[in-house]
Amino acid sequence: MAISVTKSGPYFTSGAISFSAMRSTFRLNNPTGTISASELLRDTNASNSDPILPDATENSDVATSTNWKTSQIRDSIKFYNLTQPSGDTNVNLDIDAQAWNGNLGRNIVKKLNLEGTCGSNSTSQSAAQLNQLANNLTIDVSGDIFGCGADATVTGPDGLDGGDALEITGGGNNIKINLQSTGRIYAGGGAGEHGAVGSDGQSETCFDYIFQNVNSGCGFCGDCSSLGSGYTRIGGCNGAGGCNCAGWGWWYGCRQTNLTAAECRKQENTVVAGGTGGAGGDGGRGRGFNFQSGSIAGATGGAGGAFAGCGGFTGTVTAGSQGNTGETGGNGGEWGESGSNTSNTGDGGDPGKAITPTGFTVTGTVNSSTIKGSY
């Protein structure tokens, strides 16, 4: 069903028009006693919250200062109402675009009854908005006005902000939002902050051996240190026959021994990086018209990268490890709440506003069940 229009009137569509009838019709706060013609002039004062005969398109025939006649009262109206029926859903309801017949900025007392649902699927657009001048308007909410919840934070680090529920920016006088006990004006929740990347795993130190020989000689073993720092002898320098030999007569002998080459070894260490840290988890999405049920928890972080190890090397000096798991993303915000923070460098997303920005009063049943979010 479409948004419908109802009026208090038109009155005096035919027949005689008496002052007593006009008094009963238009001066509702004092329907007894006499009423003068001056009281029945069309009141165009935009700041008057209770005009006797209001300024309205339908009342344009009624004089405002002089030349008033009873005939001008014919087909006049007192109040002007619009109603969104229960069961209807309007996305991004443009209040000032409805069938006000030019009366939105006039001082006729008006009411917009929102009995269905207003919602938004975009955080950049409020669920319902009034962007033009309005006077003497009551928005009576017995249904729902739900802002858009922020999408999950898939890139980081900051969570996205939730969307507003009701936006009133046109200005004017006597603008009220009246909440029935069944009414709900809920701002969209912010998204959780993206989880931080997990830390890298412990590096491992692997080693290989480098082998070289150093020539020995007569009476001496080769010096492994001549190869450079870190070389040590692990073998060689075995006897390989005499040297520096001589004989006298029947005796022959060697004063020294030839030695085989010195067998040298050096341990060469290589640092192998630990496994890379796992990706941080996505921040949870915020509650909103676009996500009224379901989990708003942040996603689990990714597993850390595998550690390559010392395969292909001779051995291990110190052991390394796999990368650490990424941090779980922050939870999204419930209606009108911020997304949760993590240890990452950003913040969870802010919630939208229940009603924004200024220039209105909130009446009726106002509690944590009927409004979620700031106003």
Which role does the model predict for each range below?
Residues A2-Y375:
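Glycine-centric low-complexity repeats
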